[in-house]
Amino acid sequence: LSTKKIYPAASHDVMYRYMYEEILIDFIPFEETALGPTNSWLKPGFKKAYPVKIGELEIKILPISLFLASKWEAYKSRGTDPRTSHDFEDIVYLLDNNKELVQDISNAEKDVQRFLNKMAREILHHPSMSEILECHLNPYTVESRIKLVIEKLRQILSLA
């Protein structure tokens, strides 16, 4: 990696975090290694990844349902407080900003649907549901956006 000017991110305590110029990159293996665990949704996610062109560069993107599943697994494995979790923040962002999310989940494999159904159930039944969602939404649009996020969670709950 160093030949490509990619170096460990010294100021971060995440095992697989590296820096390329000013960009943080997480390299997470598909299989568990001596360095640590993996995320069970990455391998199936990259099998279904599709190419996207950004200028001259082509990258592969995970289907949103599998990316969301990977974020929920990451949150469950290391998050204790959804209000301060970066993984949970990402989950709320995806729920808030991806118009195709529910459709993608409805087309996903049944195991993905069941996993995300549990996620939706857990969030909707959280004793501080409004608070854990609101703290990751724009304060100027929180009233309308929280309704949208809750509606998407209900739709996900109805899929499996």
Question: What annotation goes with each model-predicted range?
Answer:
Residues 1-160:
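Compositionally biased terminal segments of proteins
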